[in-house]
Every structure is written in C-alpha cells, then in structure tokens.
C-alpha cells in the first residue's frame, strides 16, 4: 500500500451466514484488522469503509423516515453487528491515528438474480436500492472528499421509488453525491 492515498475497502462477507464464527468474523473482523493496520503502516490518508443499512434494520421498517446517521442502530443480526464494529473501529482509527475515515452505510446492492427478485417484490427494498453506477459515483465522491474530513457516516442509495428511507444530506455535503438512478436501473448488468 506504499504511496496509496485512499483505500476503499470492500472485501467482506456481505450477508448473515449459518456459522458466523467461521464464515463471517474472519473476513469481517480479522480481515478488517489486517486491512486497517496495513493502511495505517503505509500512511494511507483516507479510508472508505463499507457499512450497511442493515445496522438500522428494524428502524428501516418502523421509521420515522428518513433515517440519518444520528439514529440509534438496530442491527438485524451478526452481519450488521460486524458493520457496527467496523463503524466503531473506524472512528478509533480516525481519532487515534489521524486518518480520514468515511463510513459508507450502503443501501442494497444486489449481487445476483435472486436478490434482484427479492428487491422487485418489496417497495421498501426498492427504496434502499443502490445501483452499480450510483455506487461508483458515491465512492468516487468519498475518495475525493475534502482532506479535512476526519470521520463521517454517510448513507448511499439510488433515488427511492416511493419513500426516502435514508437522509442523503451528509453524502451530498461531504462527497458531492447525488443519486442519478432508481430501481431497477443497473440491474441488467447483474444477470
């Protein structure tokens, strides 16, 4: 990582699994540790770390909407708990090591046809959909954000179909992110 100024860390197990001790914690906790330490040792200035809207799972259904980064977390399960850890340790690295850390609370980025069908069945999932192109725009904005950004939690989704579930004001302000797409834009590349 020598000479790297910004690192977008996307390596993780992205869902709950039957055996979290063996299949979730190693990539999402131990892998994160190794990534953060390598970045720190190499002098990486900006880390963009992927969290998830799943840290607010129950609030996603209960409201009031839109949720923002100040709403207390209500995780769905162990996957979301690993993302809560990521958010906390990211804050520690920003405070202790002077790194710029942006936490990306991502909407649903489907990875296969089954997930696309799940999203198609529920408007709430369509409202938190994040298209591949909007994800790219968001991450570019995070990497290019002002160097004085110390620690931020930003939500990222495409345009909602019905209800704005996540407030994107901070993402607009910090990462100049403005979603351009809406469900089902971009799903054709998943097949």
PLM-predicted stretches and their roles:
Residues 26, 62-97:
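Catalytic helix-loop patch of NAD(P)-dependent Rossmann-fold dehydrogenases
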Residues 1-27:
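NAD(P)H-binding glycine-rich loop region in Rossmannoid oxidoreductase-like domains
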Residues 51, 87-112:
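Conserved beta-loop-beta element that borders a ligand/cofactor-binding pocket
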């Amino acid at each position: 990582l020598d000479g790297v100024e910004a690192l977008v860390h996307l390596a993780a197990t992205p869902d709950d699994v039957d055996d979290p001790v063996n299949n979730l914690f190693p990539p999402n906790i131990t892998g994160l540790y190794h990534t953060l330490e390598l970045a720190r040792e190499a002098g990486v200035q900006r880390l963009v770390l992927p969290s998830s809207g799943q840290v607010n799972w129950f609030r996603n259904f209960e409201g009031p909407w839109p949720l923002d980064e100040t709403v207390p977390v209500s995780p769905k399960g162990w996957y979301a708990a690993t993302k809560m850890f990521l958010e906390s340790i990211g804050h520690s690295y920003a405070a202790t090591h002077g790194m710029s850390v942006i936490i990306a609370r991502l909407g649903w980025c489907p990875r296969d046809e089954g997930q696309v069908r799940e999203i198609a069945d529920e408007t709430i999932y369509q409202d938190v959909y994040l298209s591949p192109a909007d994800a790219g725009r968001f991450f570019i904005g995070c990497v290019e954000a002002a160097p004085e950004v110390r620690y931020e939690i930003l939500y990222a989704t495409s345009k909602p179909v019905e209800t704005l579930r996540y407030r994107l004001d901070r993402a607009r302000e910090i990462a100049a992110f403005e979603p351009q797409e809406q469900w089902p834009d971009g799903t054709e590349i998943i097949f």
